[in-house]
Amino acid sequence: MDFNRRTAMAAGLGAVVAASGATASAATPTTVTVTVQGEAAARTNIPVRRDRRASGGRYLGLWTTEKPPARTGWYATYTVHVPRAGVYALTAVATAPVETPHTEAVASYPHLSVNDGPFTEIARSQPHWYESPPAWGDLSVLDLGVIELRGGTDTLTFRVTEPTVVDDTTAYVLTLDRFTLRPLEGHPALRELSVPRHREGEPALLRLALDGHTTHAYRVRYAVSDHHGRQAATGQATIAAGDTSATVTLPDLPPGHYLVRADGVTGRFARLPARPAVTGPTSRFGVNVWASSLVPPSRLADFAAALRDMGAGWVRDGQSWPAAEPEPGGYDTAQHDRRTRTLRAHGLAVLDVLSPAPEWAMTDASLPLPADLRHAYRYARRLAAAAPEALQLSNEPDVDTTSGTGDAHAAFVKAAALGIKDAAPEPCLVVLPGIAQTGPFQDVMLANDVVRYADVWAFHGYPDPTEPGEPSFPGAADEQHELARRHQADVPLWMTECGAFQKARPGEDLTPGQEIAQARYVVRSTVEGLAAGNDRQFWFAGPPLHDDGVYFGLLDRDFRPLPAYSAFAALTSLLGAAHFTGFVPGLPDGVRGFAFDSGRGERVTVVWADRPVRLDRYVTGTAYDMMGRRLPTGRPVTASRDPLYIATPADPPPPPATTRPRARLSPAEHIVLAQRFSARDAAPGKDDGDAPPPHGYRLGRRTRMTVDVYNFGATARRVTVAAQPVGGGWTVRTEQGREETRIRVPAGGRIGVDFTVRAESSVRRRIDRRLAFGAMLDDHSEVPASVALIHLR
C-alpha cells in the first residue's frame, strides 16, 4: 500500500530516522524515539479505519468473526528505520487483551515478529495490562516489552491468530493507533532470572537471560534466598559474547520458595516436594482459573502443568454463554473446548460454571436468566455433552446486580440440572450455584427443593477485609454445613471460592509480608475448610489477578510462583488424600492442631499458633515447615504463625465408603414450575446481597401473574397445578376463580397458567409472605413446589 515517507533530524545527531508513517523525536539530547502510525503498514490484510481521535485521524482496526488465513493470520508488517542497533522499549496505543479500569473492551493477544523471526505471543498477565493508562476511546497505552533491532531498516509484524470473547460473540480483534520505539541506554542488560519447576532431587537450572546480544563476556553475580529472606546460595555466571543467555546449576536445596537476585533483577522459583500430590477428580484441592480472561493462549499448557505440579486436582473455569450461543441453537464452544482439553490433558478435573444468559434469551423481567427455561435445559445439555467432570449452575447469584429472585433461580437450576442429567447415562456432576453468603436468596432457593436435583452443594467464603491483622477463616463453612443439615441435604459440600483480599501495589503487587501472609492463609483456610467438612476446597485464584486494587493470584504478574504456590504444593504433597480425622487434643493454649489420614499409612497433623510455642512434649514424628522442608530431627519443634506438619506412621485407612448411587430423576421431577411476574412487579435489587427486607415481588392490591409449567420429560403429562394458602389477607385464584387447574403439557413443552393474587385491606405494606404453588401428576406423584416471596408495595 502507498504511504508517506517522513524524515526528521534528531537534535544534534545528524541521523536521519525514517519509517513508514513514522515520526522521530528527541527523548534526550542523545536518544531518538520513533513513532509509527498503525495505518502505515507496508503490508497488511487488516483494514484501516477513520477516527478523529486517532493520532493521524486513522488507525488499524481488525474486528471480524472470519477465521484468519492459515499461512499468515491477520497481520500488519511495518518497515522501521532506527539510527543504530540495540535494545528498544516498545509501547503502543492499542486495545488491551483484558478489561482495564476505563473500558470493558478487549482485543486478541497479539503476536510479534522482528525481522522475519519467529512469532512470539505478547503473553503478559492481567495485572500488567490492567494498569495500562487510558489513551482514547477503548485504547490504552500498552507496554509491550523490549525488542532488539539491528539498526537501519528493521521490520515488525503484528499478527492475530486467536479469537477473543467480545460481548455476545467470539471475534478476532486488533486495534492499533500507533507504536513507539525508544532506545534503552546501557543495554543489553539482564532481563530475566528463571528456574524451571522441579522437584527435590532434580537439578535446579538457573537461566540468566539478557534483553539482547552482548558484544563481550557478560559476568553476573547472583544470590538465592528462601521465603524468610535467608541466604541459601550464591554464585556467578558468564554470558559469552554474541549470546543472550547462560544456564548454571544451583546447589541442592530443600523444598520451598526462593528468590534469586542479580543486577537489580529478581527471579522466583519453586522447588517442589519429591512426592507428588493426589491429582484428578479424587483430589480435594482445586483452584479458580477463568482461563479465557486470565491466561494467554500460549501460556495455558505450562500454566496447567504448574497447577498439576502444585497438587491441584480440580480447576474451576467457565465460558460466556452469550458468546457460546450467539443465537438460539447456534453453538460456538470450540475455543472453550480447546482450553478444557488442555486442562484435562494435564490431569486436571474441570468444574465449568454457567454464566448469565444471552441478551436474546432474556426479558426485563427475567434478567439475568432466560425467559424460557428450555434454553437453559438445552444449553446445559450441550455443555454436559463435552463431558467436564462437573458443571456449576451459576456464580454468586445472591449478590449480583440484578433483581433476580431465589425462586426464579431455583427454576433455572432445575431446568439446567435436568439438561445435564439427561445428557448421558453417567452425566457429569451437577453443582449448585456458588452462594456468596447465607440469606433470603439462598433460603428461597432451598425452599424450592433444588438439592434433590444436585450432586454437590456449593458456597464461597472470604475473610472480612476490614479486620486488622492476618486474614482468618470465615464462618461461611459452618453456616453452610448447618444449613445443609437443617435441609437434610445428603450431598457433599464444596467451597468453590476461598481467598484473601490483599491490597496490591501498582506495578509491584504484594509486599514480602503480604506474600507470606497469603502463603499462611492458603494452608490455614484449606485445612480449616476440610476440617469443617468441605469435600473440595477451591482457592481463588490461580493465575495472576489484580482486581480493583486487590491481588488474588498464586503466581506473580510474570507467571512466576509466589510463596503461596509453594505452600500449596507442600500442603497437597503432605496431606495426600486429606481425610480429616479430628482436632488434636491436649495442645498448649493458643495452638491449633488438625489431624489427617493421608491415605498412605500416615497420620499428618497440621499445627499453628499466633505466638511461638514449643511442642516437643506434645507431638512426635517427622516435622516439615510450611514449604515442605523436612526439619532436622532432635531439634525443638515450635508452633508459630507458619503452619507445621508432623507425620507419623498410622494404620492403613479403612476401605472407602460406598458411593451413594445417583438416582435418576422421576417424571414428576422433570416437571418444573416457574412463577412469572411482570417487570413492574420485580423484586427490589439485591444491593450486593445486603439489601434490607422486603425481598419479594412487589405487588399491588390485585396482581395478575403466571405459573409456567415445563415438561422436560419425553412423554406428555397431565398436571394439576394448585396455589397453596398464603394467609395474612392474601388470596390466590385462577382466572376461573379456582385454586387449582388441570392441564396437559406436551413433551418438551411449556404451558402458562394464569392466576390473580389479591391483597385485602388488612394486608400491611412491605411485609414479605411466601407464595407457593404445587403440582401433581395423574399418578399422584408430587412435583417439586415453586416458592416465592411477595409483599404489598
List each model region and its residues.
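C-terminal beta-strand-rich structural cap/linker in extracellular carbohydrate-active enzymes
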Residues: 634-670
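Carbohydrate-binding surface patches
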Residues: 93, 586-621, 626, 717
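Aromatic/acidic polysaccharide-binding cleft in carbohydrate-active enzymes
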Residues: 506-566, 584-586
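Active-site cleft segment of glycoside hydrolase catalytic domains centered on the general acid/base Glu
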Residues: 361-454, 460-479, 505-523, 553-555
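Mature N-terminal, pre-catalytic/accessory segment of carbohydrate-active enzymes
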Residues: 28-38, 74, 81, 160, ...
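N-terminal substrate-binding region of glycoside hydrolase catalytic domains
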Residues: 275-378, 392, 398
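Extracytoplasmic
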Residues: 28-189, 734-735, 747-754, 775
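Aromatic-lined carbohydrate-recognition surfaces of secreted/lumenal glycan-active proteins
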Residues: 416-442, 487-501, 534-545
